[in-house]
A protein has these predicted regions:
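Accessory terminal regions of nucleic-acid processing enzymes
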Residues: 1-140
């Protein structure tokens, strides 16, 4: 995690240089009861998530030239929360080419995530209500 934060500015600058995109850094974005903290927004429709991988893993990824499946949930969740249409993942290690792959909204996947998040929030609401009832009973 520290490594990622250390290299993030360098990766962001390299992405900007390669793509010409204007990156808007933002904090936590809320959409109802869900939220995310993307690395950058791009224009009206896109965004960027920056990751680091050790050189041997990054080279493997470059050779496969596929969106890394271990980041699908995060990126699709971010697309859901931000209501954006596409999201780039930039994976970096100094001295290795920046790997960039774009993901587009997968509506079926997003719907499954939304259903599970709604289910979880319902369970959470019930737990909170039970705790409140118990604390009110103790206070009475």
């Amino acid at each position: 995690m520290e490594r990622g934060h250390e290299f993030e500015p360098e990766a962001r600058d390299l992405y900007t240089f390669q793509t010409g995109a204007h990156l808007e850094r933002v904090g936590f974005i809320r959409n109802g009861r869900v939220g995310c903290s993307p690395d950058s927004l791009i224009g009206e429709d896109g965004g960027l998530e920056i990751k680091t991988k050790l050189p041997h893993l990054l080279i493997e990824l470059i050779l496969k030239d596929e969106f890394p499946p271990e980041h699908k949930a995060q990126v699709q969740g971010t697309l859901w929360v931000t209501k954006r249409q596409w999201w780039d993942i930039g994976i970096y290690w100094p001295g290795v080419p920046l790997f960039v792959k774009r993901a587009y909204r997968d509506e079926a996947y997003i719907q499954r995530v939304a259903t599970e998040v709604d289910r979880f929030n319902g369970e959470l609401d019930e737990v909170v209500a039970q705790i409140r009832r118990r604390s009110e009973a103790v206070a009475a």
